[in-house]
A protein has these predicted regions:
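Short amphipathic alpha-helix segments
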Residues: 70-89
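Structural recognition of the beta-strand scaffold that forms the well-ordered cores
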Residues: 64-67, 91-94, 102
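DNA replication initiation on ssDNA origins
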Residues: 1-62, 169-172
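Short beta-strand
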Residues: 91-97, 134-139
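Short connector loops at helix/strand junctions that flank enzyme active sites
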Residues: 58-61, 87, 98
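A generic structural motif
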Residues: 99-106
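DNA replication initiation modules
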Residues: 1, 50-72, 107-176
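Hydrophobic, Leu/Ile/Phe/Ala-enriched alpha-helical segments that form helix-helix packing faces
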Residues: 26-36, 81-85, 121-129
Length: 176
């Protein structure tokens, strides 16, 4: 299992930079979709799995990944999400395509199923005037491709962990 700090280090590091730059130059959606599935690492923010499907969920992580696609003004939406009145931000980064955002928030399911809680969160987001959330995230086993984003945001509570340098990877070596 990897944590928020591991993912942040990966995203802000150089590990996915070549494939992110290549993807953003692609013109067709089918080509880009194939490229993502074969060239990008991914994680499942919402849980730990034996195999990546809902029935193989070992433990929910207490996190939810909200995906905003085709965003007109990335910086404006980023600020609105960081200042959201109901949800805290654990991690926020630009999607592999470069035209969306991935927003990782903490959740307390309190016995709710992931997909029902996700829909409630999506409705709350919509009610506060933000763009529609991609509903594919309602699948607890949904993978999230990890791009290069040197400007990714991580919650300040992780400051000490982010600054701790427990290893010195060689160029191209994955941090986890």
């Amino acid at each position: 299992a990897v944590g928020i700090v591991d993912v942040y280090r990966y995203i802000t590091g150089h590990y996915a930079q070549p494939q992110t730059e290549a993807l953003r130059l692609m013109l067709t959606s089918p080509e880009a979709k194939r490229y993502k599935t074969t060239h990008f690492d991914y994680c499942t923010f919402s849980g730990l799995f034996g195999k990546r499907n809902e029935k193989e969920l070992i433990m929910h992580s207490g996190l939810m990944c909200l995906d905003f696609d085709h965003v007109e003004d990335i910086m404006e939406l980023k600020q609105k999400l960081l200042n959201h009145e109901y949800f805290d931000t654990e991690l926020l980064f630009v999607s592999p395509s470069g035209n969306g955002l991935k927003w990782i928030i903490p959740v307390d399911l309190k016995g709710w199923e992931h997909f029902r809680y996700f829909k409630a969160v999506a409705n709350c987001i919509k009610a506060t005037g933000l763009p529609l959330v991609d509903m594919s995230g309602s699948d607890v086993a949904r993978s999230c491709f990890l791009p290069h984003d040197p400007q990714a945001y991580i919650n300040p509570k992780y400051k000490d962990d982010v600054e701790e340098n427990i290893f010195r990877p060689r160029l191209g070596e994955c941090p986890f």
